[in-house]
Amino acid sequence: MLNEKDLENFLKERNVNFEIVKFEKNVVTSTSAANQVEGIIIKSILLICDEFPILCILLGKDRIDFEKVRREVNCKDVRLAKAKEVKEITGYDIGALPPIAHKQKITTIIDKKLTEIKEDEIIYCGGGSHYHLLRIEKGKLLKILGESGNKRYKPINF
């Protein structure tokens, strides 16, 4: 299983400015994270579309429109990945999932609202454990996502 140290090593290898922030209380939901930091929270949610994983990256306060995802990726069935699937596919637990540094390449969809945030704006996202968040500039995160080799769909409004 992967954790905050694996995420930290992944980012250090890419020579990126970031911080893995540790909390006393868990930050497993975007609401619990928002209660502990000032700033923009994004979340990474793994879906299964016709048995293939799709990672959706969106603002913490927003919800996924499953029908939009289904149409975008041209599949019949879309569902949330089960906890076991999240761990098997990404290497991380639900509630700790970062948008990067996964066990395998995962097709990704980014919320269009995320692309509208200033490049140097600080965002917080899953930090690899239930007690850590990744603090990073939005532009740096999107650059890493672009270099990941993951298939990406155009940004959509969730």
Regions found by a protein language model. Name each.
Residues 1-158:
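Extended, low-hydrophobicity, polar/charged segments
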